[in-house]
From Swiss-Prot:
The keyword RNA-binding applies. InterPro entries: Ribosomal_uL18_bac-type, Ribosomal_uL18_bac/euk. This is Large ribosomal subunit protein uL18. The gene is rplR. One of its GO terms (biological process) is translation. Residues 12-22 have a biased composition (Basic residues). It comes from Clostridioides difficile (strain 630) (Peptoclostridium difficile). GO terms for molecular function: 5S rRNA binding; structural constituent of ribosome. The keyword Ribosomal protein applies.
Length: 122
């Protein structure tokens, strides 16, 4: 009998495997990304203190007013720019990118490129 692969379970396995190797410090916190069907979320986390330093999502008014639909690449790029702008204001310029088990493609790639354009280094 054939079984269809559970994509989210596979993503979680990839995420666990990557998280064993990646952790954010106070010098280089972790830029963590979560993607749903309709929105995208990004957080900058200091894993040593277990504190979220900066967060942004496509649910914020600044992003919602700039795009028609919040679940596309355009919205992801705006979220990347927004999280980078907030991070630079707090003095964070270098991060470790945690793609959350997602492939570096589409919305995840756009978020990363938007964050890089706005001043984050990773």
């Amino acid at each position: 009998m054939l079984k269809k692969a559970d994509k989210n379970a596979n993503r979680l396995q990839r995420h666990k495997r990557v998280r064993r190797k990646i952790s954010g410090t106070s010098q280089r916190p972790r830029l963590c990304v979560f993607r749903s069907a309709n929105n995208i979320y990004a957080q900058i986390i200091d894993d040593t203190k277990r504190v979220t330093l900066v967060a942004a999502s496509s649910l914020e008014a600044e992003v919602k007013s700039a795009v028609n639909h919040t679940g596309n690449k355009e919205a992801a790029k705006k979220v990347g720019e927004l999280v980078a702008k907030k991070a630079v204001e707090k003095g964070i310029t270098e991060v470790v990118f945690d793609r959350g088990g997602y492939l570096y493609h589409g919305r995840i790639q756009e978020l990363a490129e938007g964050a890089r354009e706005a001043g984050l280094k990773f």
